[in-house]
Every structure is written in C-alpha cells, then in structure tokens.
A protein has these predicted regions:
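Short helix-capping/turn signature of helix-turn-helix
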Residues: 48, 107-112
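C-terminal peripheral helix-coil segments that are non-catalytic and often amphipathic
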Residues: 93, 97, 125, 129-141, ...
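Hydrophobic alpha-helical connector segments
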Residues: 71-101, 141, 149-156, 189, ...
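Short hydrophobic/aromatic patch on the recognition helix
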Residues: 37-48
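Amphipathic alpha-helical linker/stalk segments
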Residues: 58-86, 128, 132-137
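Basic, helix-initiating cap at the start of DNA-binding domains
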Residues: 1-23, 28-36, 52-56
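Hydrophobic/aromatic residues within well-ordered alpha-helical segments
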Residues: 51, 58, 62, 66, ...
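Short alpha-helical scaffolding segments that buttress acidic/His motifs in well-ordered protein cores
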Residues: 88-91, 105-108, 156, 160, ...
Length: 202
C-alpha cells in the first residue's frame, strides 16, 4: 500500500511538472494533470487539495536543490574568472535539467517578489554583495575593464537564463529542433563564461 501511494504521488508530480512547464500554473488545470498522470481528478485532489499546493511542491522541490549550488558558487574563495565559470555552469545545468524552473521563477517573481525570494532561499540569500565587491576590487586593481558590478552580474545571469525563457521562439525562429537546442545549451556552459570573461579582459 505504501509503495502504491508513493508511486501515485510520483506519477502526479511528474505529470504536474510536464503540464506546468508547457502551460504555466494559471494555464494548467487539475483535470489535465490527472489525465497526464493516468488517474481520475478525485484521486488527484485526495493527494493535493489545490493546484497551488501541487505547484508549490513541484517547483520548490527543484529550486531547493539548486539554491545551495548557486550560493556555494557565489561564496567560493576563487578568482573572479573561475567564479564566473562556476556560476554560469550552475545556472545552465539547472535549466537544462529542469527547463520549467526559469519560467516558474519569472512568473512567481512578478507576483510576490520579496516573499518568493525569501521562500526560495529559506531567508539565506546568495551573497551577491560579496560578488559585487570582488568585481569592484578587480576593477580598482586594473585587472579587468571598468564595469559596474551590477551590470556584470546582470549580463551573466541574463545570458544564462534568457534562452530557456525564449526556447519556443528560438526553435521556431531559427528552425532548429529540440535536440539541437539542447546541444546548444550544453555548449553555452563554456560559451557564456568565455563571452563574459572576454568582454572584461584587458
């Protein structure tokens, strides 16, 4: 019985992840999720009373895995170039493995940004001020081109996440299939930090 309950719950979470990925929380229905999971709607409501509760569990299970990886990449005592590589790799690998997460994040940030960010990181936010200070020190030492730390951080984050948010447009507009898109994203693990580092090198 316990195994059956576990199997059913996993089927629901897997189905919900797929439906939410394509339609978002507002566009998805519990009936669609039940159909995808191969169960009836009443059983779905037995496990999850509302779409909001199901959405939160699906999303935060994935985000909670990523949060410590990002925080560690930012907090590591390594040189700036290595840190840029580490952050880009963490972001892009997360998005490759969980392509729905960036879409979820944007949706929730537009609703309750402060609450969402606190919940996402359990109140322990990544140390972006430390990263900004490290960039500032490198600029002042003449090791990299003059740039506001905020611009460098935003450039890096944008280049990591934006292709995943615009995936449908890129696939249609550039006439590529999903396999090629995924291969391009894997290449960006190296391409993005190289582009960023080349832009600040003296």
């Amino acid at each position: 019985m316990v195994n059956k309950v576990y199997t059913t719950e996993i089927a629901i979470l897997t189905a919900a992840k797929k439906i939410f990925s394509f339609k978002g929380k507002d566009g998805a229905t519990m009936q669609e999720i039940a159909n995808e999971a191969g169960i009836n709607k009443a059983l779905l409501h037995y496990y999850f009373r509302s779409k909001d509760l199901l959405f939160e569990q699906v999303f935060f299970e994935e985000v909670k895995k990523f949060s410590p990886i990002l925080k560690n990449a930012i907090a590591q005592e390594v040189d700036l170039y290595q840190k840029i590589n580490n952050i880009c790799e963490a972001y892009i690998l997360m998005a490759i493995e969980n392509p729905f997460v960036p879409v979820f994040v944007i949706g929730e940030l537009n609703k309750q940004p402060d609450l969402f960010i606190q919940k996402m990181f359990d109140g322990d936010l990544p140390d972006f001020p430390k990263l900004a200070f490290q960039i500032k020190q490198e600029v002042e030492a003449g090791n990299i081109k003059p740039i506001l730390p905020q611009h460098l951080i935003m450039n890096m984050m944008s280049m990591c996440v934006f292709p995943f948010l615009m995936k449908p447009m890129f696939i249609v507009g550039m006439q590529i299939d999903k396999e090629l898109f995924n291969n391009l994203m894997l290449q960006r693990i190296k391409e993005v930090p190289k582009f960023i580092i080349d832009s600040i090198k003296i």
